[in-house]
Every structure is written in structure tokens, then in C-alpha cells.
Curated annotation (Swiss-Prot):
Keywords: Chaperone, Coiled coil, Cytoplasm, Nucleus. Residues 25-59, 95-115 form a coiled coil. PANTHER family: PREFOLDIN SUBUNIT 4. It comes from Arabidopsis thaliana. Heterohexamer of two PFD-alpha type and four PFD-beta type subunits forming prefoldin co-chaperone complex. Interacts with ABI3 (via C-terminus). Interacts with PFD6. Binds to HY5 in the nucleus and at low temperature (e.g. at 4 degrees Celsius). Interacts with LSM8, a specific subunit of the LSM2-8 complex, which is a core component of the spliceosome. Binds to HSP90 to facilitate the formation of a larger complex made at least of HSP90, PFD4 and LSM8. The gene is PFD4. The lineage of its organism: Eukaryota, Viridiplantae, Streptophyta, Embryophyta, Tracheophyta. It is found in: Cytoplasm; Nucleus. Binds specifically to cytosolic chaperonin (c-CPN) and transfers target proteins to it. Binds to nascent polypeptide chain and promotes folding in an environment in which there are many competing pathways for nonnative proteins. Together with other chaperonins, contribute to the regulation of gene expression by modulating the spliceosome function on pre-mRNA splicing post-transcriptionally by acting as a co-chaperone of Hsp90 to control levels of LSM8, especially in cold conditions. Required for microtubules (MTs) (MTs) organization and dynamicity. This is Prefoldin subunit 4. Belongs to the prefoldin subunit beta family. One of its GO terms (biological process) is cortical microtubule organization. It holds the Pfam family Prefoldin_2. Disruption phenotype: Hypersensitivity to oryzalin (a microtubule inhibitor). Increased sensitivity to high salt treatment. Smaller plants due to reduced cells size and associated with lower levels of both alpha and beta tubulin subunits, as well as highly disorganized cortical microtubules (MTs). Increased capacity to tolerate freezing temperatures upon acclimation (e.g. 7 days at 4 degrees Celsius) associated with a continuous accumulation of HY5 in cold conditions, characterized by a lower ubiquitination status. Induction: Accumulates in response to cold. Reduced levels upon treatment with geldanamycin (GDA), a Hsp90 inhibitor.
């Protein structure tokens, strides 16, 4: 805080380090929003794969249509069940990694908030609206 005799004392000097911390916080905040979208998408995909697996159990047909790229191919039901299970496991692992990354970033953001609020007090707003 920079105080001079004729000034009110409310002026803050923003150092290069402070600006870097603010920029880092901003990037982390943007990443959290991206991760939220990715997590939501991964959860939906996991649920859809679970539903597909359940529907496949109820299917009477030995050959089912399975999407490969942009086309559907007739594939034996057992192969499709295996593939759906593999896809579900991969999606759930990906979801766990995304949630861990988000947790790590939120921890970093909390530490930066503490540092920035300690210096700037009410002069800075780092909260979501």
C-alpha cells in the first residue's frame, strides 16, 4: 500500500507480481469453467453408455447396429456389450481425471484469493456473480 501525506491512503500499488497472480487466477478460473463443461459432457456420456448397455441386455437380436465413425454396422451383441463396457470405463476414468484436475485448480485459486485479498482487501473482486 502506498501512502503519502497528501493522499488518502486508498491507492494501491499493483506490482508486476500482483498482476501475474491476477492473470494466473483468471486463467485458472477460465480453466475451471472449461472443466465444468467437460465434466458435464463426460457425465452425460457415461449415463448414455450405461443406458445403451441396459438396452442391449434387453435386446433379443443376436446382431445389433453399432456406430463406427459415421456409419452403423451389424455387429454381434456380445462384441457390442464388450465395446460399450470398455467405452464406459474409459469415460469414467476420464471423468475422474477431470474432477481431480478441477479440485487441484480450485485449491490453487483459493491460495491465490487469500494472497490477493490480503493485499487488496475490498479493492478487488475475485468472486463469481
Amino acid at each position: 500500500m502506498q501512502q503519502q501525506g497528501s493522499k488518502s491512503g486508498s491507492e494501491m500499488e499493483v506490482t508486476w507480481e500482483d498482476q501475474q497472480n491476477i492473470n494466473i487466477f483468471s486463467r485458472l478460473n477460465n480453466r475451471v469453467h472449461d472443466l465444468d463443461d467437460d465434466i458435464k459432457s463426460a457425465k452425460e456420456k457415461c449415463e448414455n453408455l450405461e443406458d445403451a448397455g441396459n438396452e442391449l441386455i434387453l435386446a433379443d437380436e443376436e446382431m445389433v447396429r453399432f456406430q463406427i465413425g459415421e456409419v452403423f454396422a451389424h455387429v454381434p451383441r456380445d462384441d457390442v456389450e464388450t465395446k460399450i463396457e470398455e467405452m464406459k470405463e474409459a469415460t469414467c476414468k476420464s471423468l475422474e481425471k477431470l474432477e481431480q484436475e478441477k479440485e487441484s485448480i480450485v485449491t490453487q485459486m483459493a491460495a491465490l484469493k487469500k494472497v490477493l485479498y490480503a493485499k487488496f482487501k475490498d479493492s478487488i473482486n475475485l468472486e463469481e456473480d
